[in-house]
C-alpha cells in the first residue's frame, strides 16, 4: 500500500527519481501496446533490479501507461480520473507531472460512469467537475523517455 511509504506523493516520486528503478511492461497478458512482453524491474542501465518503493513504483508505472495510451490516441485537454486511481495521490501527481498541459481532474464521484452515460443523452446537462490538481514541481520527462526506451 502506498500509505506504507513515508512522505508526500511528490517526496515519494522524488526519492524514486533520485535512485531510479523502472517497472517495464507488461504485467498482464491481456494485450495492449506491449502484448507479448513480460513485466520486469530494471535499473537505469536496463539491468535486472530488485524494486524498492514498490507502491510508488506501481503507481508511477500505471501513470506512465496511462500517459502512453493517451498519447497513442492523441488525447488533448483535461483528463478525468475516477475510481481507485482518483484516490491514489502518487498516481495523480505523476500523471499531472507527465501531462502538465492537460488538467488532471481526480473525481471522487461514485457514479461517474452513470453520469457519463447520462451526458451522452444530454450533453448540456449541468455537471460539477472536480478541481484540477496542479502539476508537482517534478520533471518526469527524462524518466518517461528512459522508460519508453527500455520498454520498447
Q: Over which residues does each language-model region extend?
A:
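Nucleotide/phosphate-binding catalytic cleft detector across ATP-hydrolyzing
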Residues: 152
Amino acid at each position: 500500500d502506498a500509505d506504507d511509504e513515508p512522505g508526500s506523493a511528490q517526496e515519494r516520486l522524488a526519492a524514486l527519481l533520485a535512485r531510479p528503478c523502472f517497472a517495464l511492461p507488461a504485467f498482464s497478458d491481456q494485450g495492449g501496446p506491449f502484448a507479448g512482453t513480460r513485466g520486469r524491474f530494471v535499473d537505469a542501465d536496463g539491468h535486472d533490479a530488485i524494486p524498492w518503493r514498490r507502491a510508488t513504483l506501481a503507481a508511477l508505472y500505471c501513470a506512465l501507461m496511462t500517459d502512453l495510451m493517451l498519447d497513442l490516441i492523441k488525447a488533448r485537454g483535461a483528463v478525468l480520473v475516477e475510481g481507485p486511481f482518483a484516490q491514489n495521490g502518487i498516481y495523480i501527481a505523476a500523471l499531472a507531472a507527465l501531462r502538465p498541459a492537460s488538467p488532471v481532474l481526480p473525481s471522487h464521484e461514485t457514479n461517474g460512469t452513470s453520469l457519463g452515460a447520462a451526458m451522452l443523452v444530454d450533453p448540456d446537462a449541468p455537471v460539477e467537475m472536480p478541481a484540477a490538481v496542479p502539476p508537482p514541481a517534478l520533471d518526469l520527462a527524462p524518466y518517461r523517455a528512459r522508460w519508453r526506451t527500455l520498454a520498447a
